[in-house]
Amino acid sequence: KIEEGYYTKNGMEKGNWSFWDRDGKKRLGKKIDYKTFKNIGLYKHLDGVFLVTGPIDGLSTAYTQAHGAVRGGRLDGPWTYWDSDGLLSAKKYYDKGTPRGQYTTYHPYGHKLADGVVNGIDDYGNLIKDGKWLFWDENGILKEEVHFNSGKREGLTISIVIAKGCSEIV
C-alpha cells in the first residue's frame, strides 16, 4: 500500500490521507499543490517532509519520487531522488533552497556516477563545484578525479583510461 484517503464526488482528493514510506512506515499528511519545484506536479505533505511525484529537475531528468524537507517554501536539508523504476538516482543537500553540500548522482545499476561538494548555483544555473570530485563511467569504473575551486577546475585532474584490459593514469 502506498496511499489511502477519500475523494469528493467530483473526484478531488479530500482531507487527510495516509501514506506509507519505502520502509512501510505509515505517515499522515495532506495532498497539496506546491510550486517549489521547476515543473508543476502533485506533492504530498508528510509530517513536514514532502514526497514528490513527477518530473522535478528540468525536462531532461525525470525523477518520479523525491523525499526531503521543505522549510519556508524552499528545499532544505538532505533530499533523496528515485527514478521511474524506484532505483536511487541522486542524493543532494540544500540550504534554504540552494544546493549546498554533498551532491551524489547514481547510475540505474546502483553505482555512483558523480560525487562531490557544491556551494550553490552560478548566474548561468550551473552548480558551483568545490574540492575533489569523482566521476565514474556507466560500468562503475572510476574515470576521473577533478579538483574545483568556486566552480572552476583548479590544480590536478586525474583521468583514468582503460583500453584492452589495462589502465593508465593520464
Predicted regions span which residues?
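Glycine/tyrosine- and acidic-biased, solvent-exposed loop/turn segments at the edges of beta-strands
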Residues: 1-170
